[in-house]
Amino acid sequence: MFLRTQGFKKLLKEAVAGGGLLVGNDGAGTCLCGNYWVMWIKDGCIPKKELAAIIELAGEVPEPGEAFRVYKEENQYEIMEGPVYNVMKNAEECTEVFDITRIVIRNGKGKPLRILQDRFRRIILIDERFIDMIDNTVLDMGSAEKPAKEARAGRLPWVFWYNNIMALHVMPIATEKNKNLISYLEETRIEKMEKEHAASEETKEET
């Protein structure tokens, strides 16, 4: 997996404490879903630490065709329906590449948001935590897992990262506070990070 273990665990715990963590099995892999993100990992490809984190919170991994939402108190069985759960298919259909720029701004609540920009200079914002989590250096080099591709977008209003065993969807964040700044930045080409899938230790800018 191209996600750092610590960030992965924190993401799951926050989902359980919030609107619930959906854990599903579509027969080919495991789907995990929070309030603003979805990921899918191919069967047999979840590392031991990450699998242990899922079982610790959910109590079990669902059987093929099953899904349930994990809350603090209990698990509730659900049905995975809708295009959002076709995680890998959606990722593979994306055609537009977004550069991860060097600029980080903050929304009205102080949350750091990373600016991503495509070839048309269009800008989207995502939670900075995902830039910190995505790291190709944590891949299992003894396996056939490939590095994650660049951030991409397609017909769904999400940002996607994926490789040959997993896919991650992240919902962009809208912020009225920085609306004028975004319009201004879309008039120029922003410098991108040198290492897109390493921790974000670059110089950050706030507004």
Residue map of PLM features:
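Intrinsically disordered, low-complexity linker/loop segments enriched in Gly/Pro
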Residues: M1-I41
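C-terminal functional regions that serve as terminal interaction/effector modules
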Residues: G34-W37, K42-D43, A52-T207
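Flexible glycine-rich active-site/ligand-binding loops centered on an Asp-His dyad
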Residues: I46
